[in-house]
C-alpha cells in the first residue's frame, strides 16, 4: 500500500534539506526545507554547496532539539561548519501541539541545558543564574554573529501532528497560545516567526485527521491575524501529488494566502518503511518509467499545488541530504522487491 511517508527519521539538524522557489531552478542555494517529529535516523548532512543565494532566495535548514543528545549536534556546529554563512533561515524543530495549543517540546534542550565554553557558539559558558540557557540561548548568540539570519519555531512534525485536529476547532485560541509561547519575554528576540508542520490536514499520517478541507486555512488565517505582518508564518506540507492524494484533501491555495511560504516536503516518497519494497529512489525530481506510484515526485507535487492556486513564489522545494536503502533487492530498476531495510547509521533503511 502506498502512502507518502513522513518518517520519524529525517536528520533535521541544519541543512538536512534545502529548498528552491521554482521546480526548474537550481536546487541548492535558493531556498529552504522541512521535517518530522521524533529523533531522526539519518546521518548529519553537509551544508548546501552554494555560498550565495539569488535575490530574494532562501536557504532554510532544520535544527532539531533532539540532536543535542545522541547525535551530539549543537547550535555551535552550525557556526563551526560554516553553515551559518550559507543559510537565510533556520527552522527550530519541534514544538508540541497538544490540547489545542502550542507547547514546549523539550524544556531541557530548549532552554535549560547549560553549555560549557567549548560547547557554546561564542566560547562563553552559561552560568547557573542566567535567565536563558539551552538551544534558545545558543540561537540568540548565533543571531548576534549573523544579524540577517532568521529563526522560525516549527510546531508539530510527524509525532505531534495529532494535536492539530483539536487546534482546528478553535483557531483563534490556538493562535493566541502559539503567539504567547513564541513571544515569551525570555526568548522573544530569538524567533522571527512560526512554522506549522501538520502531517496531514484532513488526511492520514501517524494519526488520521478528519477536520475537513478548510481546517488548514482556518489555522493559518488565525496565526497571521495574531502574529501580524512583521512575523514570518510558514507551513511544511505534503508532496503527495497522486490523484486523490493528500494535496487534494485540503485547501492549500486558501491557506497560502496567509503564509509567507510553504516548505513542500518533496522527499521520502519511497523507503524501507515498506520493508519488502517496492524499491525506488526516495526523492525523485520527476516521474520516470516504472515509478511505483504516479504523483510521487517533486514535479507532480509542485504542478498539483500550482493547479490548485498556490503561487510558485510561495513554494520551497525540499531536498533530503541523505540516502535510503533496502537489502536483498531483486533488481536494479525501480519497482523491485526486497527482504528488508539496509543497515543505517542511526536506523535501518
Predicted region positions:
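Secretory targeting and sorting signals
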Residues: 1-39
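Low-complexity, acidic Ser/Thr/Pro-rich repeat tracts that form intrinsically disordered stalk/linker regions
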Residues: 35-54
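Glycan-recognition patch characteristic of GH18 chitinases/ENGases
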Residues: 52-184, 348
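Loop/turn elements at helix/coil->beta-strand transitions in domains of secreted/extracellular proteins
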Residues: 55-60, 85-91, 145-152, 187-194, ...
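A cross-domain feature marking catalytic cores of carbohydrate-active enzymes
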Residues: 63-65, 94, 153-157, 195-200, ...
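A general structural signal for stabilizing positions within well-ordered secondary structure
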Residues: 80-81, 185, 253, 306
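Substrate-binding surface in catalytic domains of secreted glycosidases
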Residues: 105-123, 201-349
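Active-site groove signature of glycoside hydrolases
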Residues: 178-210, 268
Amino acid at each position: 500500500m502506498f502512502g507518502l511517508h513522513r518518517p520519524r527519521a529525517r536528520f533535521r539538524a541544519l541543512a538536512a534539506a534545502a529548498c528552491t522557489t521554482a521546480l526548474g531552478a537550481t536546487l541548492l542555494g535558493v531556498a529552504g526545507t522541512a521535517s518530522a517529529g521524533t529523533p531522526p535516523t539519518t546521518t548529519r548532512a553537509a551544508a548546501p554547496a552554494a555560498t550565495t543565494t539569488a535575490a530574494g532566495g532562501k536557504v532554510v535548514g532544520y535544527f532539531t532539539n533532539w540532536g543535542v543528545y545522541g547525535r551530539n549536534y549543537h547550535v555551535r556546529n552550525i557556526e563551526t561548519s560554516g553553515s551559518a554563512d550559507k543559510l537565510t533561515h533556520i527552522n527550530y524543530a519541534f514544538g508540541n501541539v497538544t490540547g489545542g495549543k502550542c507547547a514546549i517540546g523539550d524544556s531541557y534542550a530548549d532552554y535549560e541545558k547549560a553549555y560549557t565554553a567549548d560547547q557554546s557558539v561564542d566560547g562563553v559558558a552559561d552560568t547557573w543564574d542566567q535567565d536563558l540557557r539551552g538551544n534558545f540561548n545558543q540561537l540568540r548568540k548565533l543571531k548576534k554573529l549573523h544579524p540577517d539570519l532568521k529563526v522560525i519555531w516549527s510546531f508539530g512534525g510527524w509525532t505531534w501532528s495529532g494535536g492539530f485536529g483539536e487546534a482546528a476547532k478553535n483557531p483563534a485560541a490556538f493562535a493566541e497560545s502559539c503567539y504567547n509561547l513564541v513571544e515569551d519575554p525570555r526568548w522573544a528576540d530569538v524567533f522571527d516567526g512560526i512554522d506549522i508542520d501538520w502531517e496531514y490536514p484532513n488526511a492520514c499520517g501517524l494519526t488520521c485527521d478528519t477536520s475537513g478541507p478548510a481546517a488548514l486555512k482556518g489555522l493559518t488565517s488565525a496565526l497571521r491575524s495574531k502574529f501580524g505582518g512583521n512575523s514570518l508564518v510558514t507551513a511544511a506540507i505534503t508532496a503527495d501529488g497522486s490523484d486523490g492524494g493528500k494535496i487534494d484533501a485540503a485547501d492549500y491555495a486558501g491557506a497560502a494566502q496567509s503564509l509567507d511560504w510553504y516548505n513542500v516536503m518533496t522527499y521520502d516518497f519511497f523507503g524501507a518503511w515498506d520493508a519488502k519494497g517496492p524499491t525506488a529512489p526516495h526523492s525523485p525530481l520527476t516521474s520516470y518509467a516504472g515509478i511505483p506510484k504516479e504523483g510521487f515526485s517533486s514535479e507532480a507535487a509542485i504542478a498539483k499545488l500550482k493547479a490548485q492556486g498556490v503561487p510558485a513564489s510561495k513554494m520551497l522545494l525540499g531536498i533530503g541530504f541523505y540516502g535510503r536503502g533496502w537489502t536483498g533487492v531483486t533488481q536494479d530498476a525501480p519497482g523491485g522487491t526486497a527482504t528488508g531495510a539496509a543497515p543505517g547509521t542511526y536506523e535501518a533503511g
